[in-house]
Amino acid sequence: DSLLQGFRCSHWIVGGCMQDYGSFTVAALGDELRLQPGQRATPFSHADEVSHPHYYAVNLKEEHLKAEMTALSHTSILRVTPEKDQLVHLVINPNSDEGQGYIEIDTLNHVVYGYNPVHRIYQGWGESAGFSGHFVLAYDARDLVDYGVFEGDNRISKGLKMQDKPRIGAWLTFRGKAGKAMEWMSGTSFTSREKALANLNAENYNYGGLDFYSMMQFAADLWCERLHTIDVEHRDQAKVNQFYGALYRCSFLPHEVSDVGDEIRYDDFSMWDIYRAELPLYTLITPKRSGEMMQSLVGMYQNRGWLPAFPCWNSYTAAMIGDHASAALADAYVKGIRNFDARKAYEGMRMNAFSTPYIYKEYQEGKGRRAIQSYINNGYIPLEDMVEEAYHTNEQTSRTLEYAYDDFAVAQMAKALMDSCRDASQRQKYQEDYNELIRRSENWRNVINPVSGWADGRYENGKWLNNKDLVHRQSFITEGATCHYTWYVPQNPEGLFDVIRHSKPMDKKEKKAEDKVIY
């Protein structure tokens, strides 16, 4: 990147092929007021940046400004220092792709309010998610010389409100002095304007009226506490830095969506990406936080009727494959995490494993396992079932392998609950579930071709596709090749090796293809 259009104030999801939502952007400009992103884009160099978990700074040479930022969970401070006496403009955009944003300048209380309605992607793409990202930005009016709102290039000086139109925003113009820093505080909420302001007050003023440097130090202390849950020593400092960089990045997802002082709730579980390593890591290093995440999943089941597979922006998505909220819940429970409602969690896990929504609209919206009836009836998902009500269609073999693992995980949950249950009839139900799910956890055998020893597509009549291409993507495999997915039997690697050991030796062509495999 060589051009900077502004600073996005958000809770960026970090990976998972998902877009940000409910955000707003703030741009700091020198001298000339330029409203639209393309107009205000200003050159910058990464050599002029400083970036830490608790602090960011960049020199905007053509604007004759130095911009610095620090942030806590719901609030931030933007600090701008002019190099010379000049006008300093602050441009604020609610980033509504649908042209449904709102912005208001409250000149009495010296606050800019706004919201950006959230819309779904994947299942129900473009539909309202039923909430907005709200923000407040507090400013010091002593050096304010102009303000207004705009739509596109249409400026309304001294205007106070703009809404439900594309490319809207507001600007504040201040008289800047060389070397004198200017600060703006912002607060966010996914609930309301009032909660955004309350979050700002709670995280700033309740800590003694934080200025930029005190907030920065407070944020640094929080990050040090988070990152030092694991202490690493190595003679190569670059490897230590790499480790802590990875730990820092994995700390963003899932993210907390509740307001300060409310019961903690998390959302945006990019589940297919995080159930293997990140969520199990949390059970080890931040067990209390892990339990809060698990209770958030339970809350989604209680409020919406189904345990989600890949919940984002307060919605079901059916993105990617598998039923890995069940795997995450089971993993947490068997590792001793107890600050979530395990029995209620099991209700949702069991429902996903054995049933599908009666109302087709609910299935379309992403509730329930995809193609669960095919999986139950056949012991695998046949190639004839194209799994059309999903963002990823087909991928039948990968789904079968992952459902088999999920069944194993739910079985472990059933066993753990059975062991602690005193009611004889309920113990019997857990035992029956365990027996069936353990049986189903061996369904991986139904998609590993016993002749070739590789994962393969299979028809409803039991015949194999007999795929010979091991290294290129196939429609029955998810984001990989058969040479990758064949090994996805973490619940029974010994059984997999036994099947492979008894398969037909590879011919020269297959061996050559295998030798070329690069993960």
Question: Can you name each region flagged by the protein language model?
Answer:
Residues 1-327, 333-401, 408-419, 427-446, ...:
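Accessory carbohydrate-recognition regions in carbohydrate-active enzymes
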